[in-house]
Structure formats: C-alpha cells, structure tokens
Amino acid sequence: MSAELIAVYKDEQIIDLESAKVLGLSDGIKALNGTEPIYFDDSPLALEVIRHSCAHLLAQSLKALYPDAKFFVGPVVEEGFYYDFKTASKISEEDLPKIEAKMKEFAKSKLAITKETLTREQALERFKGDELKHAVMSKISGDIFGVYKQGEFEDLCKGPHLPNTRFLNHFKLTKLAGAYLGGDENNEMLIRIYGIAFATKEGLKDYLFQIEEAKKRDHRKLGVELGLFSFDDEIGAGLPLWLPKGARLRKRIEDLLSQALLLRGYEPVKGPEILKSDVWKISGHYDNYKENMYFTTIDEQEYGIKPMNCVGHIKVYQSALHSYRDLPLRFYEYGVVHRHEKSGVLHGLLRVREFTQDDAHIFCSFEQIQSEVSAILDFTHKIMQAFDFSYEMELSTRPAKSIGDDEVWEKATNALKEALKEHRIDYKIDEGGGAFYGPKIDIKITDALRRKWQCGTIQVDMNLPERFKLAFTNERNHAEQPVMIHRAILGSFERFIAILSEHFGGNFPFFVAPTQIALIPINEEHHVFALKLKEELKKRDIFVEVLDKNDSLNKKVRLAEKQKIPMILVLGNEEVETEILSIRDREKQAQYKMPLKEFLNMVESKMQEVSF
C-alpha cells in the first residue's frame, strides 16, 4: 500500500484523484503533466491528504454517534487536524476512545471517498438548515463548491482527500477543547477535537512517544517544579511572575548577551513604556496594529503602551544629527512590550501579553546592509551553538502590497541572499512573505524533540525611516535616508526560556542553570564549612544553595536531583578536614573527588567556556 498514488502536487497545489476526475481528465490523475506524484507514506504532502481525510472520518463518526451534530471546519494544522462542531450532547475527553472506535469501524468498511461540485445555490440548498455550513460558505468567494462523500456522510470541502477510508489505519484523537465560532469571542463556543494520523504504524508510534516526552518537558510543568515562574489570576492572564530561580536564569542569559553586544559595537538605549498616540500614527501602528495595543489617557492626551521598541529607537536616532561616519549605529534594548492577545491563545511563556524582547535596531546606509546582516548571522550561529540548537533560515520576499520601487527591493533582497550565502546557510524562500516595508529573514530553531519554533527575525525596513524623515549626511554632504534593520535573535526572553526549558527538559547547562551547585552538609558541624564555600563560589558568580534543612542525607540529595542542579557536593568530616570535595556531576554522569582549590578553578573556567 505504501507505493499507492493518492494525489499529485502541481502549481503549489495538491490535486487528489477525485479532483482529477471532476476536472474532466479521461485518464484521471495520470493525465496531468508536470506534476510531482504523492504516494501513501509519511511525507509532508501525503500527511496533509491523510490528515484531512481523517478529519472527515472524525466528523462522520461524530454524526453517527451524535445525530444532531453540526460541523464548522476541519482543517489540517501543524499538530495534526481538528474539527469544530456543536451538539446538544455533553462530550468530554472520556468520550474520545468511543469516537475513535467508531472511526476505526468506518475505516474498516473501506468506504469510497467521492467528490461532486455544486453551485452556491445548490450548496445552500443541500445544507439547508445547517447554519454552520452557511457560515462557512459566507466566507468563501466564488460560486463553485466541492462536496466530498463517504458512505452516508458528506461535507462541504475543497479537499484534498484519499480515495478510500481503507487507508486510515494509524490515527489517534489527542485532545478536546473549546473554540469560538470563527475565532471570534463574540460568537458561540463550539467543541474542537484534535487528532493525528500517519500512513505507518511507526510514524504514529514515534509521534505518540514525542507527545509523552513533550508532556514531561512542558515548560509550564517545569516552571512550577523548578520554581522558575508563575501566573496569578489576581494579576491577570498572560502576565508572568518571574520567581528568584527563573529570574537568575534569565539574568544570566541577559548578561551573556549584553557582554557580546557591547563587544560587537552595540550601544544600550532605553525608551519609555508609553508614547503619545501621535507617534503611533506616524509609524502606522495606530492604523494597522491598534487592535493589538493597549491605550491610556493622561491629561486628556491619548498614549499607547508600546507593542514594539522601534519607535523609541527612532527617537534616540533623532536626538542628534548624524553623518555617514557615524554609521552603522547599533542600538539595543531589553524592551518590555505589551500586546493584546486573546485569552484562548495564551500559553504559558510561549504566548503572553507582556514580554521582553532582545531587541536591536541598526541604522545604516544601503551599502552596509549585507555586512550588518552577515554580522547578525554570525552572532546567531554562536548563540544557537551555545544552547545546542540546530536552526534554519527562511527568506521572505516582496509581497503584493508593499512600498518602495522594484530596484530597491531587489537590492535589499539580494543583500540578504548574499549574507546567507557568505555563511553557507541553506535557506528556504517564502515568496511574497515579506513585510510591506522590506524583506526579512526568519530564524527557526529545532529542539530536542525535533519541533520547530519561530524565534528571531532580521527585517530590512525602508518604511519607518521615510515616515519619520530620518536622515544622515553622506559623503557628498547631501541628506540621505538610512535603512533601518530590526533584529531580535531570541525573539523574547519569555518565549526563548520556555523553548529552552523544554529543549533540555529542565536540565539546563551549567552556565545558565538557575542553581548551579548544591552544597549538602551532613550534620550541623559541617554547616560553617558549607557557608564559607558558598561565599567563595558566589565571588565567582556561581548560583549556589546550601540545603541545610533537618532532613536525611538521601532526602536532601534526592531534592537536589529533582531540582536538576548540575553539581551536588556532600560535605562531611572528610571533606571539612582534607578540603577534598565529593562531587556528583550530572553532566559527566559521574561522582569524583577534587581538591577545593582545583574545584574552584574548574567552576571558574566552566563559566568562561561559553560566550557569544
């Protein structure tokens, strides 16, 4: 079965077997020229077809179990597929096995999946009395609609789909949630069931293993267990509280970045948290980003709480006159920003309403774009290497709606391409995916569970310098407009630390661990030595804790291990008298002894091992 053709890929579109017939091709899909065949396997294109059909299998099963069920949409998403629906019956996660069993029953029935096309009028009549399907049709332009049918079940859909339910053998329903109709909080709440599907048993098994690992590594769970951060309903959703250990971890990353930024010629700056709405109108945020912003009024003047740091940095640039000799100017700020996110999308530290960006803006001449971007790529590589992340780049080019002339866009895009080539970085191209004001490079990192995360970005901006009338004096003593490069490598500290926590499963490397060394005195008489050693380690900028509660030695060691502390030192008579320390080293997965002075030198050198 693995070699069976299920669809083809042509002109960036998947065409299934049924669609080929509807197109009037006498030999079906084989008559299509210039196509890429899609076979039944675990390749990305095949999985899109498989998961879409599995969403319909889910809907068919729900209809059989709950005859009053009505369906909205059931798309393929990054984590599999889902279907939004409503029913008068109460459904919980306990019902998922029953629904899954019904899906398997229909799959074994080997139902042919067929397609027909209807006019809008016919489709409205076919789904008469189904307000959810009418809502779907109201959002679709055009007068032709596809309807796919399997057994007694049919659904409005453009495809693509498998030719038969017999292909669907390896799937799993993963969770149940609520979802507002069309994502609008003002609409009714629907039920959403998520699922996953693969062509092979191995694909499903590997995925389910990853899901279990992800649950163990969930940064929200680790945040509580390790005392890193918390949320408080009295404060508000999406507003994290950094606890001492989490703040230590974050500070270490901030300090390492600051050292590197200063060495790379960046200047620290700081803008206000709130700015008059007048500047947000100049920047375009007021017209294009207002729904994501918070506002307040002071002395009858409207202010916007900043969702981005760029305007503040522009004002820093405008605080003095500049010549070509000053450029490039590199400003950085750990800028706190606020963005209005709907409550349904908030997710631990990954999606919050207040966060801090490792933000920088570079003001340079057009000719300096390539060298500046090249330096950022070098910086990015060192950071990702330090945290053991693999990563990929995506270059986004000019969209249909944009400002500036073709020549400027082409030069800016080529400068980014040349910088990527200079560093021998393979990259994908997202045609038309750039911002309206310039091309960009997105940095996507891959964690230990092979999940990809969008973090940093490098954006060339030719819009804001024009809006704010920025200028520098060039070599000919004429005013020239600088280019502005927006640059964030981590993205935000909140998001990066969430990803970092899950990547390492809380076992942070020594150089950023919130507690690097645990000292465990066996008895009260060893406590003085532990405190002296603690002071020596603190002088070397080591985060150290003395576990001196009145517990058994084994319990204290287990506590330190549970807290995922990289080094544990047990201090007894022998250690105090000889100053030869007993060390449990998580990284080396070993226990060994070392003289005190040698140990202090070792941890000092470990702190110097990592730099960006």
UniProtKB/Swiss-Prot annotation:
Belongs to the class-II aminoacyl-tRNA synthetase family. Residues 218-509 are annotated as: Catalytic. Its cofactor is Zn(2+). It is an enzyme of class 6 (ligase). The keyword Lipid biosynthesis does not apply. Transmembrane segments: none annotated. Binds 1 zinc ion per subunit. The keyword tRNA-binding applies. This is Threonine--tRNA ligase. Zn(2+) binds at residues 310, 361, 486. Catalyzes the attachment of threonine to tRNA(Thr) in a two-step reaction: L-threonine is first activated by ATP to form Thr-AMP and then transferred to the acceptor end of tRNA(Thr). Also edits incorrectly charged L-seryl-tRNA(Thr). GO terms for molecular function: ATP binding; metal ion binding; threonine-tRNA ligase activity; tRNA binding. It comes from Helicobacter pylori (strain HPAG1). NCBIfam families: thrS. Its EC number is 6.1.1.3. Its main location: cytoplasm.
